[in-house]
Design a protein with these regions (language model features):
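Conserved SGNH/GDSL esterase-like catalytic core that processes O-acyl groups on lipids
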Residues: 1-39, 58-65, 69
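Alpha-helix initiation/capping motif
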Residues: 18, 32, 45, 107-108
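Structural recognition of the beta-strand scaffold that forms the well-ordered cores
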Residues: 19-25, 49-54, 82-85
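Short, functional N-terminal and low-complexity linear motifs
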Residues: 38-42, 81-83
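Alpha-helical scaffold elements within enzyme catalytic domains, especially in hydrolases
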Residues: 42-43, 73
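Acidic-histidine catalytic/liganding microenvironments
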Residues: 44-47, 78
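Catalytic His-Asp segment of secreted/periplasmic serine-dependent ester chemistry enzymes
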Residues: 61-137
Length: 137
């Protein structure tokens, strides 16, 4: 998350952020902390929306689950923060994880396509919700 924050702040400084900022930085031991997520929210410029993609790591629930819960809390607290709940989609579709490391979906072309479609649709649903939602005042 900290490396992503550097890129995010550079994009803010260069004024290249789109209205909807999608943040998907929560896998492979991302260095999650509530404070870093708070910094993403507080740094978001006025007139923008933040879409947080919940992380999934089927090997353990520890930090990944805590990050997901905090992202859901942020979406309840701020009406310009939205959640693409990849974690929920991932656990509802165990077939995409068969024969994998439980971080990267798809052990064959069929399950790779299915996982990619599920991931994209999860984000699209959040974008659709944000399209009718508020921006940061």
């Amino acid at each position: 998350l900290s490396t992503g924050l550097e890129v995010y702040k550079t994009d803010i400084a260069n004024r290249v952020l789109k209205k909807q900022v999608i943040l998907a930085l929560g896998t492979n031991s991302s260095g999650y902390s509530n404070e870093l997520l708070d910094e993403y929210v507080s740094s978001l410029p006025k007139g923008h929306q933040l879409i947080l993609v919940t992380p999934y790591d089927g090997r353990s629930e520890g930090g990944v689950l805590a990050q997901r819960e905090y992202e859901l809390e942020l979406a309840k607290k701020y009406d310009y923060v939205f959640v693409a709940d990849w974690h929920q989609t991932a656990i509802e579709n165990p077939q995409i994880w068969e024969g994998t490391d439980y971080v990267h979906f798809g052990s064959n072309s069929e399950s790779i396509i299915e996982g990619g479609t599920l991931y994209a649709n999860t984000i699209k649903q959040a974008i659709d919700e944000a399209n009718s939602g508020n921006v940061k005042p």
